Regions:
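Metallo-beta-lactamase
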Residues: 6-10, 103-152, 205-211
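Conserved beta-strand hairpin/beta-sheet module of binuclear metal-dependent hydrolase folds
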Residues: 5-66, 154-157, 161-165, 266
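Active-site-proximal loop/helix segment associated with metal-binding centers of metalloenzymes
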Residues: 148-152, 168-203, 245-251
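Short acidic active-site motifs
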Residues: 89, 293-298
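Active-site metal-binding motif and surrounding structural segment of the metallo-beta-lactamase
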Residues: 45, 56-103
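Active-site neighborhood of phospho(di)ester-bond hydrolases with catalytic His/Asp-centered motifs
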Residues: 50-52, 74-82, 102-105, 163-166, ...
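FMN-binding flavodoxin-like domain, especially the glycine-rich phosphate-binding loop
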Residues: 4, 175, 186-224, 229-230, ...
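Terminal amphipathic helices with adjacent charged low-complexity linkers/tails
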Residues: 228-254
């Protein structure tokens, strides 16, 4: 009986690892519940490992691999994706299995050499749509460039209908005992982390993600084995729909209010705007302090909610620096399905509202015509304008369009 690996099908085993040490994925995105690095081994007449793990957890992966191989050789390692959380364990694997061949595509060649000193003549290269017969296993490879690196690809094993999807359909969070979608409370523990993973890591490449989904749409998929998060065997249509909605940036009726405040006056502005939203009957309101909330969660809420209101104080005749950082990140996301509102504050020289206008106009975003700019603590007229901005946003969200400027 296998103690550490987990058998998936007659020939397929899970040998992935959990990382509860790394605090931020890509040193940017918080991991409050850790992350899993999924790796798989097909044990047949030729033994095939599908994706390695991060080097910090490779020994645990090898322990599981040895348990499955029972002294047999490892013949092939498939490199679906070169990001080091999936490839940095390769050198250790090659030290243990020096006769093993790597399978990758042309775009991975320079990366493998620059990261690990592996030369092109040591590789088996596969084209888009090419099928390889590796002993008694047949795999077809599909290139999925920029989902989310240029060399990214997936493979499909037709006999069992298994798609090895690399980062596509991935999610943050460790796998704590159970590894399948129907063995975990997905909506409770993983849905939010799947959304945040997509938005933070893949979102800016949504056009390419939709192309990849289209390319894979004709396959008879019975199971999806991603490189992060649970294995999908019982709700294939559900996860494909979740991913399609994310790639299309399907928004929900709600408003994310993000403020940058130093001494509390701008925060008070945000509270008045929220009051206006609520007075129009919109209940789905999220408010964040841009200086305290990690960018990961700010981007996720901006992607999710139809209405976004940015409120910033001025700082050295410009945007409050954390707000400036957020707007720069938002530019990369290329979000076009939102309705935007902006407001600014200043003490002697402005800059905040100017910076926010440059952002929404430069990105050609749908923005509300009312753009309050408040000096100091504000006046009664300012307070009225802020409440009206909230009301205007709530109406725009419910109607799905920006009102005409009066």
């Amino acid at each position: 009986m296998k103690q550490f690996s987990q058998q998936i099908t007659d020939k397929l085993y899970y040998i992935g690892t959990n990382d509860r040490i790394t605090e931020q994925f890509e040193n940017m995105w918080p991991l409050p519940d850790g992350v899993a690095y999924n790796s798989y081994i097909i044990k047949g007449s030729k033994n095939i490992l599908l994706d390695s793990v991060k080097s910090t957890t490779i020994e645990e992966c090898i322990r599981k691999l040895d348990e499955v191989l029972e002294g047999e050789e490892l013949h092939y390692i498939i490199v679906h994706h070169m990001e080091p959380d999936h490839s940095s364990g390769i050198p250790t694997l090659l030290l243990k299995y020096p006769n093993c061949k790597l399978i990758a595509n042309k775009r991975a060649v320079k990366m493998l050499e620059s990261y690990y000193g592996i030369k092109e003549d040591e590789l088996i290269l596969v084209d888009d749509g090419e099928t390889l017969e590796l002993g008694d296993t047949k795999l077809t490879f599909y290139h999925t460039p920029m989902v989310h690196w240029p060399e990214s690809m997936v493979s499909f094993e037709e006999e069992t209908g298994t798609l090895f999807s690399q980062d596509i359909f991935g999610a943050f969070g460790t796998l704590d005992g159970a590894i399948y979608d129907d063995e975990v409370e997905f909506d409770r523990y993983y849905l939010e982390e799947m959304s945040r993973y997509y938005i933070n890591i893949v979102g800016k490449y949504s056009g390419q993600a939709l192309k990849a989904l289209g390319k894979l749409g004709g396959l008879d998929i019975k199971m999806i084995c991603p490189d992060h998060g649970p294995i999908w065997r019982n709700n294939i249509e559900k996860v494909i729909q979740i991913y399609t909605d994310l790639a299309n940036q399907k928004t929900e009726d709600g408003v994310a209010i993000i403020f940058g405040s130093i001494y509390g006056n701008t925060e008070r502005m945000a509270q008045l705007i929220a009051k206006g939203v609520a007075e129009e009957g919109l209940t789905n309101i999220r408010m964040h302090d841009v200086a305290k909330t990690p960018q990961s969660y700010l981007l996720a809420d901006c992607w999710r909610y139809k209405g976004i209101i940015l409120i910033s104080c001025s700082y050295d005749k410009a945007l409050f620096p954390p707000m400036a950082f957020l707007t720069n990140e938002l530019k990369h996301q290329k979000m076009k399905n939102n309705i935007w509102g902006i407001a600014g504050s200043y003490s002697w020289n402005g800059g905040a509202i100017k910076g926010l206008k440059e952002f929404v106009e430069g990105e050609k975003l749908n923005v509300l015509p009312l753009m309050p700019e408040v000096m100091g603590a504000g006046s009664e007229k300012d307070f009225e304008d802020l409440i009206n901005l909230g009301k205007m946003m709530a109406k725009a969200v419910k109607e799905g369009k920006v009102p005409e400027a009066e």
